[in-house]
Amino acid sequence: MTTNIVGKVKWFNPTKNFGFIEQENGGKDVFVHRSAVDAAGLAGLNEGQDVIFDLEDKNGKISAVNLRIK
């Protein structure tokens, strides 16, 4: 697991329960699911919001977990 990645919320759709985070280091955009938002105790994510997160690989699918507001 890669930890403490800095990024910015590209978009998050609360109706569809997912979105994407743009990595500050220029890497690929990272999928974020509502369950990670809920686990972080956040009400939601806003476009352009700065976040810190870890990358989790589940069966070859990368997603953001352990979200923190920067």
UniProtKB/Swiss-Prot annotation:
Where does this chain mainly localize?
cytoplasm
Tell me which domain of life the UniProt entry assigns to the organism this sequence originates from: Bacteria
Q: Which GO terms describe its molecular function?
A: DNA binding
Q: Which organism is it from?
A: Rickettsia bellii (strain RML369-C)
Q: Which UniProt keywords apply?
A: Activator, Cytoplasm, DNA-binding, Transcription, Transcription regulation
Q: What is this protein called?
A: Cold shock-like protein CspA
Q: Where in the cell is it found?
A: Cytoplasm
Q: Which InterPro entries match?
A: Cold_shock_CspA (IPR012156), CSD (IPR011129), CSD_CS (IPR019844), CSP_DNA-bd (IPR002059), NA-bd_OB-fold (IPR012340)
A single Gene Ontology CC annotation of this entry is:
cytosol
Report the residue ranges that make up the CSD domain in this protein. Answer: 7-67
